């Protein structure tokens, strides 16, 4: 499990740095502990794996003042765990569900244990996110989404992808644009 912690940290640092996410922004984590363990999503949920990954992600985001939103599975309509103060300050709709291994998943259970005052919210519009195990985080990332290829494409048996976002380009051929801080062009 030490290797899981080390690899998770490397991936998170890579994605956070390249996404150009700012303090106060939201970052979504989608996680299948089953996929990390080499099983099909939802078939071998592991609280231990969820705790390791969420603890590392929280640590790296807290260092940067970025807020974590942990996505649950389809059985909780992909609701997300955030800190209550984040839900209130961003006027997010709080919903009533307590995650378990088979409704919400191991990452949400870990977030409930590791956060100070966790609540579930129906949806967010995050600036970036990390998807470990093909959990489909795109519905919670703001437009325009930019795929980021992480420094490692697998974590255990799980496929790893990431998304950043940028403002829409409007105005057409006559318009000038600010530099794309994600792609540096």
From Swiss-Prot:
Family according to the record: Belongs to the UPF0340 family.
Q: What is this protein called?
A: UPF0340 protein SPy_1898/M5005_Spy1614
SUPFAM superfamilies, per the entry:
TTHA0583/YokD-like (SSF110710)
Q: State a single Pfam family of this protein.
A: DUF436
| Species name | Streptococcus pyogenes serotype M1
- Source superkingdom: Bacteria
